[in-house]
Amino acid sequence: RPGQVLPNGQIADPATGLAETLEAVKDTYYHSGPYVGIACALKNAGVGVGLPDYGRCRLVVEGGTIHIHAGASCIGQGVGTVLTQIVSQAAGAPVSHIRWHNPSTATAPDAGTTSGSRQTTLTGEAGRRAAKALRRALFARKGLVYVSSSTPSAYLEDVMVEEESPETAAVRFTAEDLALLDGTEYYGEYYGKTDAMGTSGKEHPVSHVAYGYATHVCILNEDGTIKKMVACHDVGKVVNPRSLEGQIEGGTIMGCGYALTEQYPLDHGRPTAKYGTLGLFRADKAPDVIAIPLEKKGVDVSYGAIGVGEITSIPTAPAVAGAYYRWNGEFQTEIPLKGTPYARKQVKK
């Protein structure tokens, strides 16, 4: 819960929603029959642990359209959609005149390694800052007064929380307004400041900028097949509900594959199986997945959006294992699980 100490010594911030994810699936767990498993997980946003962790974004206005160039690859998490929505919100400009470009070293600023689990928070904040600079420039170009106040974040170092006055926040711009800034560029950067592992002299080091939390429940039929997976995720601010639910559903199915069917045999580090024989979970075997996004005021960057990435698959396998333990009484410590209706012939390693 907020204010308690995480295993790494960091204080859980006010955005922590693990308890809420448990509450959200409580009735499902207790009223879905005898063969039910449950598991929780947390996942960091950002590289953290004192390593360089930048989000960088460059906005170019041409032809009354804002062009987004960010050093963040879209690897399935929908970063282009997230950035488009954040830039639209921050600039007060229509989504129809905002275009995200695939990242290129020729046009996008270098933002370090590509890690999907940090783009919503770090690159999203960089995009917000760049869009705010564009918004201020447009206020000045149109002779409007921009009024806002800023206060330091209560728990993120070197972060100021800005709030526009009601009159300023009500101003929205059109494509014709954006054309007034044709040929201009705006840059946004956010550095997720964290402490290195083993930092001495600091009782509660900040290992990561933010964390997401999740609880998954696996429900089995009498014959041992999976009836349903329920996945509740604390993601801070929900940016795009449909994309978020798709991420949760896809990651949960991946977790089912890890738990039940996938085998990745190696010979001195070299894979020996073909893609078709790895045992990826087949579509006709996929159970229903009930995705429950939990929205809670997030951290003081990127409008509180933490996002969702690898965490969607992390608690699935232990939840599945717990359900099968209640089904056949066997406590298993290796995956894929044995003795299930999905079990395949073991591949020699």
Regions found by a protein language model. Give the residues of each.
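C-terminal catalytic domains of large/alpha subunits in multi-subunit enzymes
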Residues: 1-45, 86-349
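Active-site-adjacent "gating/activation" loops or surface patches in catalytic cores
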Residues: 47-63
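Structural motif
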Residues: 65-70
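Gly/Ser-rich, acidic/histidine-flanked active-site/gating loops
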Residues: 73
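Conserved strand-to-helix beginnings and helix N-cap segments that scaffold or border functional pockets
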Residues: 80-81
